[in-house]
Amino acid sequence: MASTLLFDGDDTLWANNHHFELAIERFTALVAGGAWTDAAIRDELDRVEEAAWHRGGAGKDAFGRNMREAAAGIVAAARLPTVLEAVDGIVRDMGTTEVALMPGVVSTLEELGGRHVLGIVTRGDPAEQWAKIDGSGISGRFTHIEVVRHKDEATYWRLVAGWHLDPATTWMIGNSPRSDILPARAAGLRAVYIPNPSTWRLEQAELDPSDDGVITLGSFEELVGRF
């Protein structure tokens, strides 16, 4: 029986978060000093990013604003202008990198596309996400593509209705328990969790090991054996 397979973009279809982690390392070195340990700096940045999450802020520009806000709470006022200028440089240096697909994506999609309906549901800044989709070379393999500001239960319900999906045969596939797995399950979809060691810390959440509507796989290529 054909299913509808919906794929996350960042760190599922293509690599993403490692660019942000490298930027965070530079930010940490930039603002370090006094009583602020590396762990405390990361916690402060996480606090700011968590608040931005709920406003739908994502992408490099939002990340830059978050670093600026965190820096304002960490460094002395006299030093702040220099630090903020350096933060802007960190964001500029992130640039527009070439899209690097995760291992096995092309061959796996080619095989799955012959049996199932494929879609992309990715969260973030629309311009950035569409640039990745267009630059990935795989957009033509998908029937449905949606860039959203929030991945919550309401979003998945909206997609089910708008795309006329059957939740019982629709699977959300991704690396984020918080964005891909839990809200999709709350909306009645099934889910495939593909862990990625580079997953953003704020995307982590506990999954119910007894939930038989979630499959955990070790790699993207393993989807072929399941579908």
Enumerate the predicted regions with their spans:
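Active-site neighborhood of HAD-like aspartate-dependent phosphohydrolases
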Residues: 1-44
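Asp-based, Mg2+/Mn2+-dependent phosphohydrolase catalytic module
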Residues: 1-3, 106, 110, 125-227
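Short helix-capping segments at alpha-helix termini
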Residues: 33-37, 76-78, 137-141, 164
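A metal-dependent, Asp-based hydrolase signature
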Residues: 43-93, 111
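Active-site periphery "cap/insert" segments of enzyme catalytic domains
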Residues: 95-110
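Glycine-centered short loops/turns at secondary-structure junctions
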Residues: 115-116, 188
